[in-house]
Amino acid sequence: MRTPAQFLGILLLWFPGIKCDIKMTQSPSSMYASLGERVTISCKASQDINSYLTWFQQKPGKSPKTLLYRANRLVDGVPSRFSGSGSGQDFSLTISSLEYEDMGIYYCLQYDEFPLTFGAGTKLELKR
């Protein structure tokens, strides 16, 4: 009789294309910045996701707002002070000149593969 570990080994050999969920690592987890300051948030994928990355802004009690898609494409109506860059595994969101309304939590999301996975978020607060 085979043990569960042996069955798992056989399954992994049988299905070489099986992948783990893509992990998205955001940094920093929180930051304080002054008005007018340039702010950059990073997001790293555990594997190549091409440019299939979206950035969201979340404010308390409100629905998430999509800022950029395909890593660097600005959604209509989003101010041009927001920009995105990167491809493959390393991405960043930059706010060129911080405004008060930019405070909130920012999330990256990969949509290269299912299940879609989010970064843990970056809380952006005003430096006093």
Swiss-Prot record:
Disulphides: 43-108
- The keyword Repeat belongs to this UniProt entry's keyword annotation: no
SUPFAM superfamilies linked to this entry:
Immunoglobulin (SSF48726)
Biological process terms in GO annotation: adaptive immune response; immune response
Name any one Pfam family assigned in the record: V-set
Annotated region Framework-2: the residues are 55-69
- Indicate what this protein is called per its UniProt record: Ig kappa chain V-V region T1
Framework-1: where is this region?
21-43
Annotated region (Complementarity-determining-2), positions in chain: 70-76
Where does the record place the region Complementarity-determining-3? 109-117
